[in-house]
Amino acid sequence: MNNPIPSNLKSEAKKAAKILREFTEITSRNGPDKIIPAHVIAKAKGLAILSVIKAGFLVTARGGSGIVVARLPDGKWSAPSAIGIAGLGGGFEIGIEVSDLVIILNYDRAVEAFAKGGNLTLGGNLTVAVGPLGRNLEGNVALRNSAAVFTYCKSRGLFAGVSLEGSCLIERKETNRKFYCQDIRAYDILFGDTPRPAQAEDLYEILDSFTEKYENEGQRINARKAAREQRKSSAKELPAKPLSRPLQSSAPVQLNSGSQSNRNEYKLYPGLSSYHERVGNLNQPIEVTALYSFEGQQPGDLNFQAGDRITVISKTDSHFDWWEGKLRGQTGIFPANYVTMN
């Protein structure tokens, strides 16, 4: 666990980067279902990261230190403001425990309440809930929209639920004054033109990586959705295949060509009537072009892709029927309404 004793803002920013990394990276202790989802941080309006010590004997007291940053209108993160946390709780607890805490401020009003007043009491008008874990929980809209504040607590390396109702985030004015070398309020740090300090660059690298992860994941999801929609659209556009199939012959039957040729070709499907006048003419074979791709579903079907040119061996007068053709040395039947005459 990290040191909860208040220190200078440079040390607090370094500690915050370390804590956030421990809450978001997959390790032997933290599996994919035990990390803060990237979309939670990428969509947050503000973020408070602290180390907290809790001591109890009949009544528990909580105190600690950390920083808070806010999301600026351009999507970047503000300079950090030093904060403390304090609170009392009931319950029969004896002992001392040090925990790391990440508080997600989901709405602008939560950030503004702290920035304008210098203090923010969790609970009351700002509902608090234990935040979701794992990488696939963004679809839980009810959970995402129900709480103004998400909390994450890790004690002894393990995530644990924590009640922060009644706890107060407190502006550490003197720490901010020493770091920024001027009297400056939290509001001016979080919403003003205060540049991001180089001392907190590690923290910003981690925060910016979540936006990148979220955007990349969003692009992958959108690509998968588009592919599914394309497949659905293509499936809807495919014409219905003929219902009845010709019966396959148990023995080959020679195809009557109707010409002087000594062709030694055999008709696979004697039940399929032939158009002998043109089909049997070697000088002018009938060719059709595939309008759609067809993947055979039974032995003897002729596979082809849209754009393939198929030589017709035998056909009927109907396009809503099965014809026989040859493509790349393979012979088989195919739905005639998947092709067009050349």
Swiss-Prot record:
GO molecular function: phosphatidylinositol binding
Residues in SH3 domain copies: 283-342
Keywords from the named record: SH3 domain
InterPro entries named in the record: SH3-like_dom_sf (IPR036028), SH3_domain (IPR001452), SH3_domain_YSC84-like (IPR051702), SH3YL1_SH3 (IPR035511), SYLF_SH3YL1-like (IPR033643), Ysc84_actin-binding (IPR007461)
Oligomeric form and interacting partners: Interacts with SH3D19.
Name of this chain's protein: SH3 domain-containing YSC84-like protein 1
Family: Belongs to the SH3YL1 family.
One Gene Ontology CC term in the entry: ruffle membrane
Polar residues composition-biased segments: 246-263
Domain of life: Eukaryota
PANTHER family recorded: SH3 DOMAIN-CONTAINING YSC84-LIKE PROTEIN 1, SH3YL1 PROTEIN
UniProt feature, compositional bias: Basic and acidic residues: 226-239
Biological-process GO terms, alphabetical: regulation of ruffle assembly
